[in-house]
Amino acid sequence: MSAQTSLAAQPASPVLPNIPVRPPTATPPPVPASTAAPAVPRLYGPPGWTVRIGLWRLLEPWLDTPRCLPGEAPLRLDALGAPVSDYVPFRGMDAATAADLLSRLPAAALSDRQNLAPSLKTMLTACAGADGQVRLCGYGIGPQREDERLSVEALWVADADLQGYEVLVEHSRDCQCSALWERVRDRYELDAGCIPDDIVRTRPEWAGGTVGWWMWWD
């Protein structure tokens, strides 16, 4: 067999289609939209911020046991250090605790106020600088709620030069509640929106029976 015959007998090479080669795209595929519900914004910080700053341990010496719910211990914490109850009342907070809280609380939380009461910052500042003559009462709201916070709703003032005022239950013309409040407000630079809803002379056990004025905002 000749070389010509042998070459002719071989099958022809297949013709490949002319497919252009394209570089891989640099744009990633779209990310599917999340079906999870968006996080609900909190009042003063992410959930658990009160636990992280140690709020509940600071409040423990001042728990208002009579205001606890029936059958509840004054303070029960879960494994994360948060209170089991979402409402933790306290009374008689002293100057050292107030000063500690001023250094720990975030700025936004210090702006909290009980309706028209003074801001938390001015209340804590008054207490911290009064060497026991000003005490605070209020409550903490736990991480279970979106309004997790510390609130002060009342202060107790024992300055000796303020004890001569006369406050009457019926707030008649002779009642000196407005004059008393103005002295307290100006002395301690309190930024309240109105006079306290209640002003009562008391001798609380957490102040050792010392006489003082209890001023409360609804």
Regions found by a protein language model. Give the residues of each.
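Acidic, proline/glycine-rich low-complexity IDRs
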Residues: R183-D218
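Intrinsically disordered, low-complexity regions enriched in Ser/Pro/Gly/Gln/His and often acidic
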Residues: R42, L55, D174, I199, ...
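Long, contiguous N-terminal structural blocks used for assembly/anchoring
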Residues: S2-R173
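Short amphipathic alpha-helices in soluble, non-transmembrane regions
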Residues: V167-Y188
